[in-house]
């Protein structure tokens, strides 16, 4: 996967993402425009994959290359030929089929044989000396679980001690969705070509891609002139959204935020949302909650303004606020329902999370000034489907949420997806497994709410908030690891993250001082 620390990624990964079907249609056009053949593109792909293998595993002396019966297999034949040419021992296993190979793959296969290479059946006993496996079985056209013979090869590769380099995409991972309906290669490195595919960034991608590498195959000039439907957002882009503040700015310039929630026993949720909003730069934060929570919240975070939630305090606060966040610890009893009914007609930007989403699923409506932030379980309730259906196509489900509920939808998870009308779609390339703990969603709500108050558009606030949230966790993970990370731990790094001009300066200075 891409580098999720604050360091610059050592491998250049683009921020544009293409559906695999669009790449397949576009690569022929690109080749024609640039005077290339598709076979020349295959040779470039094989060369790029070979270089990744050599760079990552310079001491590997016996490569096992697994070739499928398609153009992904053609790339594998090129890798095998290049490895053999430099004296590496290569064992190549090929999947046979009654169908002829695509023209380009057939040429690559012929070149391998002409170079003295041999092709073995896929069911042979693997040599004991194999110390690198190259996965070129299945490409980006896969739509379902691999068939049994390929699944057996995948399982064998995964159980073998040799590292695996996947060509274009790990076999068994769906390029459009990141779903894994059957067996899937667990790669240590993946080299993908021409453009990033969404399935490399969301769903199960992080479990199976390893370190992600990219090569445009020389199509940069053509790619630069194309519009893409999906964007990858990462920590490097925070400076695009979060500019240095004017020296004369005051607290009123940075947003007046009201946060509503914290029913009996859930004061922690509303406290985390409130502090996250402050740490993300909100000018003023008012919390409306149960009276029993007032003293503990003020003691824990005196910068918050904390009031009992009543109809009068809610009415006055809605008039005062620039932004409303509702849901953390709200509950689904009458207390929370009445507050949500009052907030529904708020005309300014608002964010609904947690129990607000569970209540929304019962009484759905469409609001264009609202950001919703469901995890897969909440998204399933909002769309009336199963969690498995949500996870099978996260991008499509995020778009469905926008179609049904309006505004901006943030479908949380590894490779969070952010969608907005009419066709804005982003994948968040930040965050880690340490965030799989209680309270992380409450912190995210506060961050996005704060950015809404700082005049970012709902879509930009959602994208920037998710990136800042994940990047703060990545700093912690790089230092302490992912196990045992708490939501409140993010506060120690969040302030750094939302001031990217300081972060960039510190990074540049440390880079310049390095020996």
From Swiss-Prot:
Q: What is its EC number?
A: 4.2.1.136, 5.1.99.6
> Could you say which residues bind (6S)-NADPHX 1 here?
168
SUPFAM superfamilies of this UniProt entry?
Answer: Ribokinase-like (SSF53613), YjeF N-terminal domain-like (SSF64153)
Q: Which Gene Ontology BP annotations are present?
A: metabolite repair; nicotinamide nucleotide metabolic process
UniProt-annotated stretches for the region NADPHX 2: 375-381
Q: List residues binding (6S)-NADPHX 2.
A: 329, 442
Instruction: Give the binding site residues for ADP.
Output: 412-416, 432-441
Which cofactor does the UniProt annotation name? K(+)
Positions of the YjeF N-terminal domain:
23-225
Name the Gene3D superfamilies on file. 3.40.1190.20, YjeF N-terminal domain (3.40.50.10260)
Region of interest (ADP-dependent (S)-NAD(P)H-hydrate dehydratase), ranges: 235-515
Region of interest: NAD(P)H-hydrate epimerase: 1-227
**Catalytic activity, reaction form:** (6S)-NADHX + ADP = AMP + phosphate + NADH + H(+); (6S)-NADPHX + ADP = AMP + phosphate + NADPH + H(+); (6R)-NADHX = (6S)-NADHX; (6R)-NADPHX = (6S)-NADPHX
**What the protein does?**
Bifunctional enzyme that catalyzes the epimerization of the S- and R-forms of NAD(P)HX and the dehydration of the S-form of NAD(P)HX at the expense of ADP, which is converted to AMP. This allows the repair of both epimers of NAD(P)HX, a damaged form of NAD(P)H that is a result of enzymatic or heat-dependent hydration.
**Record's protein name:** Bifunctional NAD(P)H-hydrate repair enzyme Nnr
Q: Which organism is it from?
A: Escherichia coli (strain K12)
Gene of this entry: nnr
């Amino acid at each position: 996967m891409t580098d999720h620390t604050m360091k610059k990624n050592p491998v250049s990964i683009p921020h544009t993402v293409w559906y695999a079907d669009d790449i397949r249609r576009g690569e022929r056009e690109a080749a024609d425009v640039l005077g290339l053949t598709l076979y020349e593109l295959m040779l470039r792909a094989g060369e790029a994959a070979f270089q990744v293998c050599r760079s990552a595993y310079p001491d590997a002396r016996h490569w096992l290359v697994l070739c499928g019966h398609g153009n992904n297999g053609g790339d594998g034949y090129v890798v095998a030929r290049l490895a053999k040419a430099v004296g590496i021992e290569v064992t190549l296993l090929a999947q046979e089929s009654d169908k002829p190979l695509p023209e380009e793959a057939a040429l690559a296969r012929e070149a391998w044989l002409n170079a003295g290479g041999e092709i073995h059946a896929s069911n042979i006993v693997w040599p004991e000396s194999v110390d690198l496996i190259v996965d070129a079985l299945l490409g980006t056209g896969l739509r379902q679980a691999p068939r049994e013979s390929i699944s057996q090869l995948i399982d064998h590769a995964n159980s073998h001690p040799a590292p695996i380099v996947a060509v274009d995409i790990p076999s068994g991972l769906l390029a459009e969705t990141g779903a894994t309906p059957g067996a899937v290669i667990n790669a240590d490195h993946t080299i993908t070509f021409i453009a990033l595919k969404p399935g490399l960034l969301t769903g199960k991608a992080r479990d199976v891609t390893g370190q992600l590498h990219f090569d445009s195959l020389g199509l940069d000039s053509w790619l630069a002139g194309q519009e893409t439907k999906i964007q990858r957002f990462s920590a490097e882009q925070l400076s695009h959204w979060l500019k240095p503040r004017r020296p004369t700015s005051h607290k009123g310039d940075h947003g007046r935020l009201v946060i509503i929630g914290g029913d009996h026993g859930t004061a922690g949720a509303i406290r985390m949302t409130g502090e996250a909003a402050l740490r993300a730069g909100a000018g003023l934060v008012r919390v409306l909650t149960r009276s029993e929570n007032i003293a503990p919240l003020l003691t824990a975070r005196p910068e918050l303004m904390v009031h009992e939630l009543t109809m009068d305090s809610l009415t006055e606060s809605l008039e005062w606020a620039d932004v409303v966040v509702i849901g953390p610890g709200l509950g689904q009893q009458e207390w929370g329902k009445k507050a949500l009914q009052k907030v529904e007609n708020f005309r300014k930007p608002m964010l609904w999370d947690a129990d607000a989403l569970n209540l929304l699923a019962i009484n759905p409506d469409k609001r264009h000034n609202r950001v919703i932030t469901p995890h897969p379980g909440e998204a399933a309730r909002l769309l009336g489907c199963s969690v498995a259906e949500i996870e099978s196509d996260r991008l499509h489900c995020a778009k469905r949420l926008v179609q049904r509920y309006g505004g901006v939808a943030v479908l949380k998870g590894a490779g969070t997806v952010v969608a907005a009308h009419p066709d804005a779609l982003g994948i968040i390339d930040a965050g880690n497994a340490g965030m799989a703990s209680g309270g992380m969603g409450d912190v995210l709500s506060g961050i996005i709410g704060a950015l809404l108050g700082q005049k970012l558009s709902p879509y930009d606030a959602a994208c920037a908030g998710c990136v800042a949230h994940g990047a703060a966790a990545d700093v912690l993970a790089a230092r302490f690891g992912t196990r045992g990370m708490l939501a409140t731990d993010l506060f120690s790094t969040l302030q750094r993250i939302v001031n990217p001009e300081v972060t960039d300066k510190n990074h540049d200075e440390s880079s310049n001082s390095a020996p």
